[in-house]
């Protein structure tokens, strides 16, 4: 049985496509990898207090009392090991004039199934582990204020100003556009538009995503990519050209991934959900 390993042949294009079309890639980082490991430990190291220097005092240390820095470990494991398979019948490929072939089928599978699944998973991790969680009823008169409050919270938490992204549902974006106080700058690059960014507002990119990608009841998530890591350990795609029992090609794919919010960076995520109806 002949096999074409698409992960080898098309890996660069597949990876580029994933980054270009993945909406969550805009708000996550790839700072950690799990090569050779199922679990890694991420350490958060504390800081020391400032003291008044004891210039004319007795003692072994004029710099203050020596204390060990706090160091906490966050243990992260790979969580999602997902796969897919489908057949491409020879007659179907011929009668569709080549429209049904491995390359196009893989692109469609990534675009319509794999990438949305990974995005949904990453967004849920962000919402569940946000440093600030609020529930609120947003109207076309309060939509802008809600985002201002979110940005102010990140400011107070000393989150970098550059690179913030507001992940918004279409319903929230609609309310924001109706709010007379909101000024949306739609002068953005094509690469950002492909990831759902529709405008910039107060320094943050406004990214509109289908509500099905976000947790139920979500208004928006304001975040900086420093907080959330998306690690894809394995992407494997194969075509078996002469499989037993199939007149045509058998396509198989696997993606092994995880996402996590670093404990000491959780304050870089602000989650706004709808107020539960009574």
Positions of predicted regions on the chain:
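Short Gly/aromatic-enriched secondary-structure transition segments
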Residues: 55-61
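Structured, hydrophobic secondary-structure cores that serve as assembly/anchoring elements
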Residues: 41, 47, 73, 79-98, ...
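Alpha-helical scaffold segments that mediate packing/assembly in large oligomeric complexes
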Residues: 91-157, 270-278
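Extended, solvent-exposed, turn-rich assembly/linker loops in the middle of proteins
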Residues: 128-198
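Sequence/fold signature of self-assembling virion shell proteins
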Residues: 2-26, 31-51, 72-80, 179-278
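Generic alpha-helix structural propensity
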Residues: 37, 61, 81-83, 101, ...
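Active-site-surrounding "flap" and adjacent substrate/cofactor-binding loops of secreted or lumenal enzymes
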Residues: 62-70
């Amino acid at each position: 049985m002949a096999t074409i390993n698409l992960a080898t042949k098309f890996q660069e294009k597949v990876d580029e496509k994933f980054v270009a079309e993945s909406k969550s890639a805009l708000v996550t980082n790839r700072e950690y990898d799990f090569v050779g490991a199922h679990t890694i430990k991420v350490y958060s190291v504390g800081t020391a207090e400032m003291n008044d220097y004891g210039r004319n005092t007795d003692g072994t240390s004029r710099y203050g009392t020596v204390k060990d820095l706090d160091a906490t470990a966050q243990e992260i494991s790979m969580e999602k090991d997902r796969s897919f398979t489908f057949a491409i019948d020879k007659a179907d490929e011929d009668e569709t004039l080549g429209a049904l072939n491995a390359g196009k089928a893989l692109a469609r599978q990534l675009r319509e199934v794999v990438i949305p699944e990974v995005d949904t998973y990453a967004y849920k991790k962000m919402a569940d582990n946000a440093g600030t969680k609020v529930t609120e009823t947003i109207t076309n008169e309060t939509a802008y204020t809600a985002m201002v409050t979110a940005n102010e919270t990140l400011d107070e938490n000393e989150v970098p100003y550059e690179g913030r992204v507001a992940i918004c549902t279409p319903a929230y974006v609609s309310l924001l556009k109706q709010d007379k106080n909101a000024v949306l700058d739609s002068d953005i690059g094509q690469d950002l538009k492909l990831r759902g960014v529709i405008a910039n507002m107060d320094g943050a990119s406004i990214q509109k995503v289908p509500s099905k990608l976000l947790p139920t009841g979500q208004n928006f998530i304001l975040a900086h990519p420093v907080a959330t890591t998306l690690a894809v350990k394995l992407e494997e795609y194969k075509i078996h050209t002469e499989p037993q029992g199939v007149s045509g090609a058998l396509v198989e794919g696997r993606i092994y991934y995880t996402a996590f919010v670093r404990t000491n960076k959780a304050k870089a995520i602000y989650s706004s959900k709808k107020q539960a109806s009574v």
